[in-house]
Amino acid sequence: MTDYQNDDDGFVSKSQRKRDMDALQDLGRELVDLSKDTLKKMQLPEDLLTAVLDYKRFTANGALRRQMQYIGKLMRDVDPEPIREYLKVLKGESSEHIAWQHLLERWREKLMADDKALSDFLAAFPEGDPQQLRTLMRNARKELQDNKPPKAYRQLFQEIKALIPEPGKPRLWQKDEDEE
């Protein structure tokens, strides 16, 4: 009589492999929807980047289907998690990104409410330009008072955004910016 052992540790069913490959193709579909500049910022492997850009050139349905399968095949050699994280950040879905945006909004509200908040902000972020921030605060308050479009209010937000770095932004396969 044969003694069968349960060797589940290395076994993946054919159905599971197909589901995994479909998930990689779906991730590839998300990549082909991105702009060329965004794709280049991601620093994808050269063959995958070329395949995604080629997909955008094709118009025949059969060619698009084959190219998407090829993209799925190339995705097998790439760790998909950094790509998924980057796409989440682009969509603004990551909890860290949302918390960062809320932090920016809180600082803007503090600065709009009280002039003394500027010294607190500059203590936390000393690279800020106090004169520029003070001018934006004054102009934003005046716009709010005169019921004008919030141009300076938005500029103040952009200035704060430039000073407070976004936490956990995935770097994927990027080289150090000092080396470029």
UniProtKB/Swiss-Prot annotation:
A Pfam family this chain is assigned to: DarP
Family as reported in the entry's similarity comment: Belongs to the DarP family.
Function of the protein: Member of a network of 50S ribosomal subunit biogenesis factors which assembles along the 30S-50S interface, preventing incorrect 23S rRNA structures from forming. Promotes peptidyl transferase center (PTC) maturation.
PANTHER family on file: UPF0307 PROTEIN YJGA (PTHR38101:SF1)
Native source species: Chromobacterium violaceum (strain ATCC 12472 / DSM 30191 / JCM 1249 / CCUG 213 / NBRC 12614 / NCIMB 9131 / NCTC 9757 / MK)
Keyword rRNA-binding: yes
This protein's GO CC annotations: cytosol
Lineage, highest ranks first: Bacteria, Pseudomonadati, Pseudomonadota, Betaproteobacteria, Neisseriales
An annotated GO BP: assembly of large subunit precursor of preribosome
Signal peptide: none
Record GO terms (molecular function): ribosome binding; rRNA binding
Location in the cell: Cytoplasm
Name of the protein: Dual-action ribosomal maturation protein DarP
Chief site of localization: cytoplasm
Disulfide pattern: none
Keyword annotations of the record: Cytoplasm, Ribosome biogenesis, RNA-binding, rRNA-binding
